[in-house]
């Protein structure tokens, strides 16, 4: 239980920081953090909660099958818990953050037909662990089917490393890392890149594509 309580505090702190940025409009978004590997368990945000508020029912423990691991409560896990389950099954990720922002939604629509967007030469790319000069990073953009298992299967194809990110078209970004700190850093880096790119497009509209 000590591990669960420690992970709870970590995830609550991340949720607090992201909520302060207004990255959870209309109860959107979901967060998780791994508690154990054998068997796999992780905490995930409860469905339908206002993530700007802090309560004792913000998260619930999930098992390796994506189901609640504890009884005695009526909480429902986030509708997209299956994506988190696949991520922890396939990689050594320890934390996963999914947020809906205007910037990531606009980027996903602008480049959705291309299925990806690439950034190059930005200093912020170093936050993703890419230190070579003029480094580039590509973010895949997947479709957003209403059927969650189909979305999770598509997402799983791109979840192959301990840290990374995937854009879901007109839906949001899912970013992850081996720790809560790394996951938040990855998320912040991509949101910066999205914001910078859109600002450049607004100043130089001829460079839209």
From Swiss-Prot:
It holds the Pfam family Aldolase_II. SUPFAM superfamilies: AraD/HMP-PK domain-like. Zn(2+) binds at residues 98, 100. The keyword Cell cycle does not apply. Binds 1 zinc ion per subunit. Catalyzes the dehydration of methylthioribulose-1-phosphate (MTRu-1-P) into 2,3-diketo-5-methylthiopentyl-1-phosphate (DK-MTP-1-P). Pathway: Amino-acid biosynthesis; L-methionine biosynthesis via salvage pathway; L-methionine from S-methyl-5-thio-alpha-D-ribose 1-phosphate: step 2/6. This is Methylthioribulose-1-phosphate dehydratase. It is an enzyme of class 4 (lyase). It catalyses: 5-(methylsulfanyl)-D-ribulose 1-phosphate = 5-methylsulfanyl-2,3-dioxopentyl phosphate + H2O. It comes from the Bacteria. InterPro entries: Aldolase_II/adducin_N, Aldolase_II/adducin_N_sf, MethylthioRu-1-P_deHdtase_MtnB. It comes from Bacillus velezensis (strain DSM 23117 / BGSC 10A6 / LMG 26770 / FZB42) (Bacillus amyloliquefaciens subsp. plantarum). The gene is mtnB. SMART domains: Aldolase_II. Keywords: Amino-acid biosynthesis, Lyase, Metal-binding, Methionine biosynthesis, Zinc. GO terms for cellular component: cytoplasm.
């Amino acid at each position: 239980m000590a591990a669960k309580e420690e992970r709870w505090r970590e995830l609550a702190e991340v949720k607090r920081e992201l909520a302060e940025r207004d990255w959870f409009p209309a109860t959107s978004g979901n967060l998780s953090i791994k508690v154990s590997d054998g068997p796999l368990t992780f905490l995930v945000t409860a469905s339908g909660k206002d993530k700007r508020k802090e309560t004792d029912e913000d998260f619930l423990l999930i098992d390796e099958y994506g189901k609640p691991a504890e009884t005695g409560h009526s909480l429902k896990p986030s509708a997209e818990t299956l994506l988190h389950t696949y991520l922890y099954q396939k990689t050594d990720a320890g934390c996963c953050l999914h947020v809906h922002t205007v910037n990531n939604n606009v980027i996903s629509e602008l480049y959705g037909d291309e299925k990806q967007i690439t950034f190059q030469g930005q200093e912020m790319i170093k936050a993703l662990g890419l230190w070579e000069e003029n480094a580039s990073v590509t973010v895949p953009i997947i479709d957003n089917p209403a059927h969650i298992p189909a979305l999770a299967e598509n997402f799983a194809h791109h979840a192959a490393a301990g840290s990374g990110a995937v854009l879901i078209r007109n839906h949001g970004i899912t970013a992850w890392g081996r720790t809560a700190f790394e996951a938040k850093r990855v998320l912040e880096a991509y949101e910066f890149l999205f914001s910078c790119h859109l600002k450049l497009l607004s100043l130089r509209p001829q460079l839209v594509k």
